[in-house]
C-alpha cells in the first residue's frame, strides 16, 4: 500500500515522454563508441579533450591502484588521505591561480558541501535560474533564503540585490561559468562588480570550462583575467580531465574552513587513488599539450559554421544545442540519428524548459565525423 504511488508516478512520467533509462557503452570512451555491438560517432560525451581513454591516464590509474589499492578506505580526516590527494590539490590550485584547493569525491558533492558550509538561515542566495542541479540543491539544503535571477541577466540580479541584500547577514551569488544544457557563458565581470558593490560572495562552477576555456585551459575566470579576484571556484575532474571527482579552489582561509565545515568532504570516503592519479596526469597533459584545446576549438568552429542555418543556441563552448519544437520530435530525431550511426542525446523537460539535441564536441573528432553529422542533419531536418 505504501509504495503503490510509485506505479502511478512512473505511468505519468511515461505519458509525458519524460521517462529515462540507461544505455550501456561497451568500449573505451572516445569519439566513437560501441553500443550493442554497433559503432557510433559519439556526440554525447563531456570528455572534451579526449583524455578519458588516453593510455597515460589509464597507466597512471593502474599504477596508483597497484601502489595504494582500490579505495581510500576512509574519510580524508581519518584514514583516507594520501599524498596523491595533496599533489592533485596543489596542481588544481596552481592551475586556477588560487592559494589552495580541496578535492571532493564528485563535482556534485563539492557544490553541495561548499554552499551548505558557507551560508545558513540568516543568509541570502541569488542563483541563475539555469544553474546546475547541484548548485540548486546545495542552495536548498543550506537553509538560506534562495532567489533566482533571470538567466544571465545582471540587471535582474542587481534589482534583487537592491531589494533584498540589506535584509540578510551574508549573500552568496551562484552561477555556472558555462551552462551545461545551453553552452553559453555567464556575464562574469558584471557578477564580480555586483558582488563587490553589494558585499557578496561569488561562487562560479567551472565544470564545463576547466580544460576548455582560457589561455592555459584554467576556465572562464582565466579567460576574463579575473583569477586574482575574490571568488570561489568549483568544478569537476570528470569532464575535460577524464577522471572522477570535484574540487573547490580559493583562498587558504576558505579551504581551511571547508575542511572543518563541509559535510560532503568530512563525512565521505576520499577520492580513490586511481581517480586521483588519473586527474593529476590529465592536468599535466592538458598543460603540456595545448594543441588538444586548439583542435577542440577548431572542431567547434567548423561545426558552428556548417550548422549556421540551423536553430542553434548561442554558445561559448563545445556544447552546441539545436532547439526542437516538441519532446516527441526531439526523441524521434535522436533515434533517427542513432539509426545513422550517430549518438546524440535528446534533452527534454524537466531537465530543461524546452527540448533540444545537445552536441558535445571533442578534440578527437575527425572532420569526416563532423561532416557526417552535418550531412545527416541536413537529410533529417
UniProtKB/Swiss-Prot annotation:
Cofactor field: pyridoxal 5'-phosphate
The reaction(s) this protein catalyses: 6-carboxyhexanoyl-[ACP] + L-alanine + H(+) = (8S)-8-amino-7-oxononanoate + holo-[ACP] + CO2
SUPFAM superfamilies membership: PLP-dependent transferases (SSF53383)
Residues that hold pyridoxal 5'-phosphate according to the record: 107-108, 180, 205-208, 236-239
Known EC number: 2.3.1.47
GO molecular function: 8-amino-7-oxononanoate synthase activity; pyridoxal phosphate binding
EC primary class: transferase
Pathway recorded for this protein: Cofactor biosynthesis; biotin biosynthesis
Taxonomy, superkingdom: Bacteria
CDD domains (alphabetical): KBL_like
Function field: Catalyzes the decarboxylative condensation of pimeloyl-[acyl-carrier protein] and L-alanine to produce 8-amino-7-oxononanoate (AON), [acyl-carrier protein], and carbon dioxide.
Annotated family: Belongs to the class-II pyridoxal-phosphate-dependent aminotransferase family. BioF subfamily.
Name assigned to this protein: Putative 8-amino-7-oxononanoate synthase
Organism: Rippkaea orientalis (strain PCC 8801 / RF-1) (Cyanothece sp. (strain PCC 8801))
Gene name for this UniProt entry: bioF
Amino acid at each position: 500500500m505504501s509504495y503503490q504511488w510509485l506505479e502511478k508516478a512512473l505511468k505519468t512520467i511515461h505519458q509525458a515522454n519524460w521517462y529515462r533509462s540507461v544505455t550501456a557503452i561497451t568500449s573505451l570512451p572516445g569519439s566513437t563508441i560501441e553500443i550493442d555491438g554497433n559503432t557510433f560517432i559519439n556526440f554525447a560525451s563531456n570528455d572534451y579533450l579526449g583524455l578519458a581513454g588516453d593510455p597515460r591516464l589509464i597507466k597512471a590509474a593502474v599504477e596508483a591502484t597497484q601502489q595504494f589499492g582500490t579505495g581510500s578506505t576512509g574519510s580524508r580526516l581519518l584514514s583516507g588521505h594520501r599524498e596523491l590527494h595533496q599533489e592533485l590539490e596543489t596542481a588544481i590550485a596552481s592551475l586556477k591561480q588560487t592559494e589552495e584547493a580541496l578535492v571532493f569525491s564528485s563535482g556534485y558533492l563539492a557544490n553541495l558541501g561548499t554552499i551548505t558550509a558557507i551560508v545558513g538561515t540568516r543568509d541570502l542566495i541569488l542563483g541563475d535560474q539555469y544553474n546546475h542541479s547541484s548548485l540548486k540543491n546545495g542552495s536548498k539544503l543550506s537553509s538560506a533564503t534562495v532567489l533566482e535571477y533571470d538567466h544571465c541577466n545582471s540587471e535582474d540580479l542587481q534589482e534583487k540585490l537592491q531589494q533584498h541584500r540589506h535584509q540578510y547577514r551574508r549573500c552568496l551569488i551562484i552561477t555556472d561559468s558555462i551552462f551545461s544544457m545551453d553552452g553559453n557563458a555567464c556575464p562574469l565581470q558584471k557578477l564580480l562588480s555586483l558582488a563587490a558593490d553589494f558585499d557578496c560572495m561569488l561562487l562560479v562552477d567551472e565544470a564545463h570550462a576547466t580544460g576548455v576555456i582560457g589561455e592555459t585551459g584554467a576556465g572562464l575566470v582565466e579567460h576574463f583575467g579575473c583569477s586574482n579576484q575574490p571568488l570561489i571556484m568549483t568544478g569537476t575532474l570528470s569532464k575535460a580531465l577524464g577522471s572522477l571527482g570535484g574540487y573547490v579552489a580559493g583562498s587558504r582561509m576558505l579551504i581551511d574552513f571547508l575542511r572543518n565545515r563541509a559535510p560532503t568532504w568530512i563525512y565521505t570516503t576520499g577520492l580513490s587513488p586511481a581517480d586521483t592519479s588519473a586527474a593529476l596526469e590529465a592536468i599535466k597533459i592538458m598543460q603540456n599539450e595545448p594543441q588538444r584545446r586548439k583542435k577542440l576549438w577548431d572542431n567547434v568552429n567548423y561545426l558552428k559554421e556548417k550548422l549556421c542555418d540551423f536553430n542553434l543556441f548561442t554558445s561559448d563552448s563545445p556544447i552546441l544545442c539545436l532547439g526542437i519544437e516538441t519532446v516527441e520530435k526531439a526523441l524521434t530525431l535522436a533515434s533517427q540519428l542513432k539509426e545513422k550511426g550517430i549518438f546524440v542525446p535528446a534533452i527534454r523537460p524537466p531537465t530543461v524548459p524546452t527540448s533540444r539535441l545537445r552536441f558535445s564536441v571533442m578534440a578527437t573528432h575527425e572532420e569526416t565525423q563532423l561532416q557526417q553529422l552535418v550531412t545527416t542533419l541536413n537529410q533529417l531536418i
